[in-house]
């Protein structure tokens, strides 16, 4: 994602302030049907997820346990980030009715990552506005799995790439929000993949680490306004970026009527129901120090998508090769890369 595009998107949520950004890769940890936030203790959960981050991810993830202290490795570049981030999984539905998982590909200037996602933490330029880092036990949910229609504002934004080169420079990738960006899955063939950005809320009520719906304790500011009185504490803007490798699925496999063939694992063929989960797991006060220092990709490098370690001396990093070695075996064991007669869990496809 181009730096200027990032600014254009996030200023909407940051009241038109300049911003500072951490951008880093998190390789794949595991892909399986577990969801300790929405379906704690249920093995398997109803639909498939792809998970990145620390290896403390499990079926329950008791909020009283600090996963920043219990995890022993992380798939993320910042070695103190043992948080877990996960989303639904994209599947291709062929004209014969069978399904195949769409793999993820690495992002621009993060080509050594094995699948996974790119994670962003954003803070405003105004250092007099305190940004409160999350606390152990904090978790939240962005998006609604059951959505099949557009809503006011957006949680997800899609971009259709035509191609990419050996350096993972994707095309087209215009500055700002492109006229072709959508809040639903693209309807045309995307030879360079489908990128989806998912944005988490930036305001917290300052009390609850979670709520039964995993949403009520946090809020999005209204059209760039300050945080509302009900949720007065400003927290980092977290958003995650996933690129699905749709190039692998030639148009000869598409439905004969040419209709959009991709569907998310909860049975969503629209993209409006894409959603993401976040469980905080940074070790110690590293994230708070980074937010206080307004660590920034752009300030640290002439190339804004490369983040050298000296860009945030408050945080420890690890090589992507080391990060790629962190993984988990499936707890809910089932095939991942075979052609399937139905979505995992026999999830029905719904349009409303």
Please give the residue ranges for each predicted region.
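Fungal secretory targeting signals
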Residues: 1-21, 352
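Primary mode marks residue(s) on the alpha4-beta5-alpha5 output face of response regulator receiver
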Residues: 19-45, 50-198, 205-352
């Amino acid at each position: 994602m181009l730096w200027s595009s990032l600014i254009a998107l996030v200023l909407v949520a940051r009241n038109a302030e300049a911003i500072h950004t951490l951008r880093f890769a998190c390789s794949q940890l595991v892909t399986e049907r577990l969801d300790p936030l929405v379906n704690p203790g249920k093995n398997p959960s109803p639909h498939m997820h792809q998970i990145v981050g620390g290896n403390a991810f499990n079926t329950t993830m008791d909020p009283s346990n600090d996963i920043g202290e219990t995890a022993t490795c992380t798939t993320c570049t910042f070695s103190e980030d043992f948080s877990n981030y996960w989303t639904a999984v994209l599947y291709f539905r062929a004209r014969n009715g069978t399904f195949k998982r769409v793999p993820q590909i690495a992002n621009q200037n993060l080509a050594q990552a094995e699948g996974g996602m790119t994670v962003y933490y954003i803070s405003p330029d105004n250092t007099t506005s305190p940004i409160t880092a999350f606390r152990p036990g904090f978790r939240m949910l962005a998006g609604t799995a059951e959505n099949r229609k557009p809503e006011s504002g957006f949680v997800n934004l899609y971009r259709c790439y035509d191609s990419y080169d050996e350096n993972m420079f994707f095309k087209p990738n215009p500055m700002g929000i492109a006229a072709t960006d959508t809040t639903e899955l693209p309807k045309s063939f995307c030879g360079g993949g489908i990128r989806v950005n998912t944005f988490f809320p930036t305001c917290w009520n300052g009390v609850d680490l979670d709520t039964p719906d995993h949403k009520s304790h946090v809020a999005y500011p209204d059209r760039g306004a300050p945080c509302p009185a009900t949720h007065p504490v400003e927290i980092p803007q977290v958003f995650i970026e996933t690129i699905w490798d749709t190039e692998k699925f030639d148009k000869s496999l598409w439905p004969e009527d040419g209709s959009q063939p991709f569907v998310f694992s909860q049975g969503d063929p629209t993209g409006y129901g894409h959603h993401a989960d976040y469980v905080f797991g940074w070790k110690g006060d590293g994230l708070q120090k980074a937010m206080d220092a307004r660590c920034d990709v752009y300030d640290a490098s002439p190339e804004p998508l490369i983040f050298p370690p000296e860009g945030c001396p408050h945080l420890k990093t690890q090589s992507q090769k080391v990060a790629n070695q962190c993984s988990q075996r499936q707890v809910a064991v089932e095939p991942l890369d075979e052609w399937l007669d139905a979505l995992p869990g026999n999830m029905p496809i719904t349009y409303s």
